UniProtKB/Swiss-Prot annotation:
CDD domains: CheB_Rec, REC_CheB-like. This is Protein-glutamate methylesterase/protein-glutamine glutaminase 3. It is found in: Cytoplasm. Gene3D superfamilies: 3.40.50.2300, Methylesterase CheB, C-terminal domain. Residues 14-131 form the Response regulatory domain. The modification 4-aspartylphosphate is found at residue 65. Pfam families: CheB_methylest, Response_reg.
Length: 360
């Protein structure tokens, strides 16, 4: 009888590493090959050197550095997503420039990104091992779409258009809570682009580190009719305003005599907790009850499922993005399984349903 290794008993995720740092290439290869469900099928110092490897190895996932000689990661990403779409995870620095580049990569079709460690390089990558494994596993089962049109870059140095400051949201109005993870930045953007300037207040919990959240808020504010900003503790919710949870904190709301206020709960680490969507949803259930609307967008894991159930128990109306338009369906699917969803819709129909509920 033939004996198989533990790796051979599973469908392996084949990973190609492209990074100009020899240290990063060695460490990523070592980490990937330690995981029994993954195999590093090749490493390359730049996209030019990677082109032949890409054809030969046909990887399931690519980890791609952004800043590299000969051809930068964004140009290479644009090319491969048009010609040979594959799940790509970007490797980005935790800086404003790195954050903007990572968000641009997501626009071009990258599945996710991993932030480079700030401190001791080897120790930092070792500490990120579980995140690397989780994101590669998610990318390995993600829905990859071919890039079929030009995606103009957002001019981040532009001034946002003037937007009127609308009235505070009273307790008789709708309050919308949105949760997302993998694939969520583009889903959130599409949702917001479909909403009018006077929509009910939206609160967004998106699994991303702090610098990326600031860049996301700025980018969305330039693109959308509503005001988009980082949520601040104690500020009153207004119509026409989108409040994004800081990457290092959970966002919740409290009810006051006049309306609702944001509450920011700082976490011990640099990232939101794994239950940031649940925390937001539970607070909306308690504060807004039947005037709440919950939206669970594409994402990995089950964050939001328990919170969606709490919102539904309080009388709220909850929407899940459908499998067809989700990059990763885990979060919507978990919320549906928890009996926390009223309606499942393709992404392009969620804004219309939200405005229908706002008028009800």
């Amino acid at each position: 009888m033939t004996e198989f290794s533990s790796k051979e008993r599973y469908t392996m995720i084949r990973v190609l590493v492209i990074d100009d740092s020899a240290t990063m290439r060695i460490l990523l290869k070592k980490l990937i090959d330690k995981n029994e469900h993954m195999e590093c099928v090749g490493v390359a110092p730049n996209p030019v050197a990677a082109q032949e490897l890409l054809r030969e190895t046909r990887p399931d996932v690519i980890t791609l550095d952004i800043e590299m000689p000969k051809m930068n990661g964004l140009d290479f990403l644009d090319r491969i997503m048009r010609l040979m779409p594959v799940a790509v995870i970007m490797i980005s620095t935790l800086t404003e420039a790195g954050s903007e580049s990572a968000l641009r990569a997501l626009e071009l079709g990258a599945i996710d990104f991993i932030a480079k460690p700030k401190l001791d390089f080897a120790e930092g990558v070792q500490a990120y091992a579980e995140e690397i494994y989780r994101k590669i596993e998610t990318a390995g089962r993600a829905k990859v779409k071919k890039l079929t049109r030009d995606v103009p870059p957002v001019r981040m140095d532009a001034e946002p258009p003037a937007k009127p400051l609308l009235a505070e949201a009273g307790k008789d109005g709708r309050v919308v809570a949105v949760g997302a993870s993998t694939g969520g930045t583009e889903a959130v953007k599409e949702l917001l682009l479909s909403l009018p300037a006077d929509c009910p207040p939206l609160l967004i919990a998106q699994h991303m580190p702090e610098p990326f959240m600031r860049s996301l808020a700025k980018r969305l504010d330039l693109l959308c009719a509503m005001r988009v900003k980082m949520a601040e503790d104690g500020e009153t919710l207004r119509r026409g305003c989108v409040y994004i949870a800081p990457g290092h904190s959970n966002l919740t709301i409290d009810a006051t005599a006049a309306g609702y206020v944001c509450r920011i709960v700082r976490n011990a680490g640099e990232a939101q907790s794994d239950s940031s969507v649940d925390e937001l949803f539970r607070s909306v259930a308690a504060a807004a009850g039947a005037r709440g609307v919950g939206i669970v967008l594409t994402g990995s894991g089950s964050d939001g499922a328990a919170g969606a159930r709490a919102m539904m128990a309080a009388g709220a109306f909850n929407i899940a993005q459908d499998a067809e338009t989700s990059v990763v369906y885990s979060m919507p699917d978990a919320a549906i399984a928890a009996c926390g969803i009223n309606e499942v819709l393709p992404l392009e129909k969620i804004a219309g349903k939200l405005m229908e509920l706002d008028g009800a």
